[in-house]
A protein has these predicted regions:
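A translation/RNA-centric and nucleic-acid-associated enzymatic feature enriched
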Residues: 1-17, 30-130
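Residue-level recognition of alpha-helix termini/interfacial anchor residues
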Residues: 25-29
Length: 130
């Protein structure tokens, strides 16, 4: 049986494999994309193979990062795209945000009874990949 940590491992290895294959085998397509981007006044893209494992930033820590970065958010709020920008400034590249409040997740997401958030709320085994 797999738990949330195992699923995150599968996802990060899959993304690492995809990016590795693109970097190794698709330079012609990357060149076509970059030719178009340059013609539109945009910078060319590069394929950067992500390192594994991806950082895990528990929801409670992510909330503190957002607050420290000047964002307005409270425990139990959703992490919105502008909050993700604050987190990404500290953790560029792929990263997981696990252990969201159980109250935010659907009924089929599991939890561990002993895991509580900073406010005492039950934490889920759910996660987001950013």
């Amino acid at each position: 049986w797999m738990d949330d940590e195992d699923v995150m491992g599968v996802q990060e290895r899959m993304l690492h494999h995809i990016w590795s294959e693109v970097a190794a085998n698709d330079q012609t397509l990357i060149d076509v994309v970059n030719e178009y981007r340059v013609s539109q006044g945009q910078d060319p893209v590069t394929v950067e193979i992500p390192n594994v494992p991806f950082p895990r930033i528990p929801y409670c820590d992510a909330i503190e990062i957002v607050k420290a970065g000047g964002g307005e958010i409270e425990w139990g709020n959703d992490i919105e795209s502008h909050h993700c920008d604050i987190i990404a400034a500290q953790y560029p590249g792929f990263h997981f945000i696990p252990r969201w409040p159980m109250s935010m997740k659907p009924f089929y997401i599991h939890h561990k009874e002993e895991e509580k958030g900073t406010s005492g709320g039950q934490l889920s085994r759910g996660f987001d990949l950013n």
